Swiss-Prot record:
Belongs to the SsgA family. GO terms for cellular component: cell septum. GO terms for biological process: division septum assembly; positive regulation of FtsZ-dependent cytokinesis; sporulation resulting in formation of a cellular spore. Monomer. Interacts with SsgA. Interacts with FtsZ (via N-terminus). Pfam families: SsgA. Its main location: other. Keywords: Cell cycle, Cell division, Septation, Sporulation. This is Sporulation-specific cell division protein SsgB. It is found in: Cell septum. It comes from Thermobifida fusca (strain YX). Signal peptide: none annotated.
Amino acid sequence: MSSSGTSITCEVGLQLIVPDRAPVPLVARLDYSVDDPYAIRAAFHVGDDEPVEWIFARELLTVGIIRETGEGDVRIWPSQDGKERMVNIALSSPFGQARFHAQVAPLSEFLHRTYELVPAGQESDYIDIDAEIAEHLS
């Protein structure tokens, strides 16, 4: 895990769940920045292909570690693998679907660091609404 005063990056090992086959191990890079304090960017690396990138709410991952949450494109829910706490992440788009299985511990550590950077409920303090509106109107 690496961090600066304005961002945090973490690589997490996941398993891609493939029907009728053994899970495929892969790495996802998670990025969080005060420039977009509500979002987590995830880049899923499969083999030598370009990473597949998704953006979803930090709160979605936070809640999904504890209980099932999300609808539509991103769903996250906890599970147990023996004594190991796990989390499932299901992604859906017009181009396909994917389901991943990951250990909770590294995701929790990543989230903890994001909340140290931008505490819950203070995300709007990091957004310049006037600048955002001006950018969209120009």
